Every structure is written in C-alpha cells, then in structure tokens.
Amino acid sequence: MLTQYQPLKLNTHIGIGIPWDLDRNIGGVSILPPYERSTSSEWYTGTANAIYQNLNYMEYYNPDYVLILGGDHIYKMDYQVMLDFHKANHADITMATIPVPIEEASRFGVCITDDTHRILEFEEKPEHPRSNLASMGIYIFSWPVLKEALIQLKDQKGCDFGKHILPYCHERGDRIFAFEYNGYWKDVGTLGSYWESNMELIDLIPVFNLYEEFWKIYTSNEWIRPQYIAGDAVIDKAIMGDGCEIYGEVHSSVIGSDVVIEEGAVVRDSIIMNSARIGKNTVLDRAIIAEGSIIGENCVLGAGEDDIPNKLKPDVYAFNLVTVGEKTVIPDGVTIGKNTAIAGKTTIDDYPDNTLAGGETLIKAGDM
C-alpha cells in the first residue's frame, strides 16, 4: 500500500491487516510511504512514479503478475476472475473497464476495443469521447512488461499510468485488453462523490450492499461500549457505529463510532465521523464532520442559499456541503452556510454576527 499525504489515520486503520486476514508470515500488507534513498528522494509525483520508487520492493518478490489498484474507489471485485482473463488472452496488460454514460466519459480514460476485447485506442479524459468504456484505474501487468515501462519512463515528470505508461505500451505494440466490469463502482476522489456514496449505503437495499451473506465487508473495529438510543430519540434511515449516544434526531445519515448527538439536535443527510459531539438544539444539513469535532449548542450548519461557490477552493468545497475538519471546535449559537469549510478551535469572535456565510472558509490552524 503506497501512502503519501497525511497518512497517519490510514496507517493506523490498516495496521498489520488483522481484520482482513493479512497478518501473514509470507505476503500480507506492507505500507510504503516515500522514503530517503541513497541516490535521490522525492514525494510520489504520479501513480506510475509511486510504483517506480518501490521497484526494489517488487523485485524482491519477483512476481509473475502485478495488480495495481487505486485507493479512492468503492466496488467489489474478484481479482482472480480478472487474472484468469489476463492469462487466457496472453495479455501483457489488462485494464478493468466499466460502461459509463457517454456524457460523463470525458471524466475518465476511455478505450476502444475490437471483438476480442483487445484495446485498439486509448484516450485519457478526452474532450470529445468516442467510447463510453471507461478505465477503472485497475490494472494487471505481466511483471517484465511493467518493469521495462517504468524504467524507460522513469524521468517522465508526474509519470501516470493513464497518461504515460498505457500510451507508451500501446505504441510499442503490447497486448492490452479490456476486462469489462458491470457491478457497482464509484470514484470517491471528491467530497461530493464521497458524500453521495455514503448516502447510498442507507437505502433500503443499497446498490453497494454491505449485508450480503456471500460477500461480507470487513473493517477494523474498536472495542467500545454498545450504542445507546434515548427514548425520545428519532432515527430514520441511518447507519451507526458502536458507542453512539443518540438523544436527538437522525435522518438519512451515517454516524461513526463513539458519536454523541444531544437532545434537540437534528442531523439530516450528513456524515459524522468517530468521537464527534453535536450539541443541544443544533441542526446539521448535508454536513461532513471529521473525527473528534465538537459542534456547540444552538448552531445551524448548512443554512442559506444553494450553489454559492467557495471563495478559496471552489472545486473542492462544493456540492452544498459543510466540511468540518478533524478536532474542530465550533462555538454555541453559530450559523454556517453551504459550500463552507471550517478547521481548528474556533471561537465566537471568528464569526461576524455569529455567522459564516456560504462560500467562506475558516481555518485556524493547519490545513484541510
């Protein structure tokens, strides 16, 4: 697993992989951040560059095949089926693909194939796509092919699989095939898609089903107390972790472990992560609250008009969401608009007229 920016939470979550049966003597999980090398050192500058910087690690195992996965996608796939497809076609590279609406295809790398599923053309995020068969960012490489391509393109700035490795391999005539996948798949690389994918989990029969007996989802569990739901609490369509205390209302929301929602509070269409606290009579609408945050009493988060662009990062803090960073404190009696971001221990003096208008950003320390 290759990590980079602020990896502590992910590293802690994965650990040595016990919940996924990955704590093995042979194989298992290794977390590989960028590191100081004898010749040079730098952060990973692209997806393929990250693999290249760990070439020695792969050479130690000398695999026959290398499976490369993105870390911000949600789906269920049996990779053995894809590997069998790769072997049956004597492929050098197999790329997992999924049909998407043609009007959305420009967001992805797309490919054109022949009747045998061999890729004839590949375009990375074309302005005018000629195919709706989109790359899922999942690849199987025969090891010698991958190694040679990485070495040849090692000086390519920001070396990326879609932009550089695949076109290079296609131009030299490698056998590249498209493995078509038709299940649920979502790229959660934006706050909007992350929020949307969480909201989909609380449908009566979610498209991405967490409850299938034949395909269980495992995670790292904390050993804490059971949930407590007060007699006056109102809960409608919600997923809640262990240790929650719910005294107010929760509607269509995902609530992490050890969260407290106090009396009179109303939470709608929101994601509240572990160990957050929502004060009395506070209203949350389309909010993402990070771990350990404290929201005061009599607050309103998600107030006012829709679609006011965020002034600092309009492409990030969007989708009419309120984004609250880890261990943030919001004082009592504050009203916060949409497309906003708040981080740090804020006080009432940080809110003119007790308000943070839509599209504003308030960051007291660090960054988001």
Model-identified regions with their sequence ranges:
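Left-handed beta-helix
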Residues: 144, 151-368
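Unchanged
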Residues: 1-202, 309-315, 319-320, 326-327, ...
